Amino acid sequence: MTQKKVAILGAGSWGTGLALVLADNNHQPVIWGNLDKIVNEINESHTNSHYLPDIILPTEVKATLSLDEAIDGAEIVVIAIPTNAMRIVCKQLNEALKEPTILVHVSKGIEPETNLRMSEVIEDEIDASKRKALVVLSGPSHAEEVALRHPTTLCASCKDLSAAEIVQDRFINNNLRIYTNDDVIGAEIGGALKNIIALGAGISDGLGYGDNAKAALMTRGMAEITRLGVAVGSNPQTFYGLTGIGDLIVTCTSVHSRNWRAGNMLGKGENLDEVLEKMGMVVEGVRTAKAVHGWAKKLDIDMPITESIYAILFENKDAREAVDLLMGREKKIEKESF
């Protein structure tokens, strides 16, 4: 395979993990970061100890503080940043891009102020003439396991399947299997909203409830995700795939999941400010819960689990009381509630 340069915007765990994959595939990954300490560590020690402790990076993984240097000559630009930084980074990228480029984003969330998905934010900020294609790379994955080269599957979603196939070709190897899909909306809705349900799974575990409770929460949570997704144009089949149920399972059941860990602390009685301070990293489900709270009301979508998690996060609702209220809701036929 011909070596290709790929720029990765974001020196966090996911950006670094994807850079490792590209280096394993004999490509030229360049990470753009904004902290001297992390950029220097990647270049000099071939580690990123804050985000991926105990992982040795291939020497082919390079990092820079210069956005221009990172994207110069890149076939693909991967945007691997927290959702709250998406607009400001895309404004910078729009100024820096000199020619149409394939853009890939791996950020899972909804913008609270606008209810826009991340691809819509990118389209808002980056001129169409500079976007060769926009691909969503998503699925059941923790960066830590990708960096350890454990078997993982993802889905590259794009309206232009030929662009999705290019991304598939650059990242696929014996450890990372990539599928393609044309349902961008479904991939983004599944990836964003599962973080809310993962907060709920953590809360359930923190309260000491068992597997039955978590299985119910995940299943009914997927019903809520599907309802909203279909209402905004997703293919319902997408939610049975990697970017739907797959991503939900891994995020609700793993100690690697920031959202599960945050929820677990909430379930044990800590308040949101304490939890976020202890986490020291972005917990996307908190921001997404705020966005979806208003969005679901606007669309008149019934999302009782999501609303309960919002109330625990932002209205000081007692978690046990929230569970009691959910369990006491009116009787329903299951198939009519999807």
UniProtKB/Swiss-Prot annotation:
Presence of the UniProt keyword Cell cycle in the record: no
GO cellular component, one term: cytosol
Catalytic activity line of the entry: sn-glycerol 3-phosphate + NAD(+) = dihydroxyacetone phosphate + NADH + H(+); sn-glycerol 3-phosphate + NADP(+) = dihydroxyacetone phosphate + NADPH + H(+)
Binding positions (sn-glycerol 3-phosphate): K108, G139, S141, K194, D247, S257, R258, N259
Pathway stated in the Swiss-Prot or TrEMBL entry: Membrane lipid metabolism; glycerophospholipid metabolism
EC number assigned by the record: 1.1.1.94
Alphabetically ordered keywords of this record: Cytoplasm, Lipid biosynthesis, Lipid metabolism, NAD, NADP, Nucleotide-binding, Oxidoreductase, Phospholipid biosynthesis, Phospholipid metabolism
Residues noted as binding NADPH in the record, renumbered to the chain: S13, W14, K108, A143, R258, V282, E284
GO molecular function: glycerol-3-phosphate dehydrogenase [NAD(P)+] activity; NAD binding
Subcellular compartments: Cytoplasm
Protein purpose: Catalyzes the reduction of the glycolytic intermediate dihydroxyacetone phosphate (DHAP) to sn-glycerol 3-phosphate (G3P), the key precursor for phospholipid synthesis.
Family statement drawn from the similarity comment of this UniProt entry: Belongs to the NAD-dependent glycerol-3-phosphate dehydrogenase family.
UniProt cross-references to PANTHER family, sorted A to Z: GLYCEROL-3-PHOSPHATE DEHYDROGENASE (PTHR11728), GLYCEROL-3-PHOSPHATE DEHYDROGENASE [NAD(+)] 2, CHLOROPLASTIC (PTHR11728:SF1)
UniProt name for this protein: Glycerol-3-phosphate dehydrogenase [NAD(P)+]
Gene name, Swiss-Prot/TrEMBL: gpsA
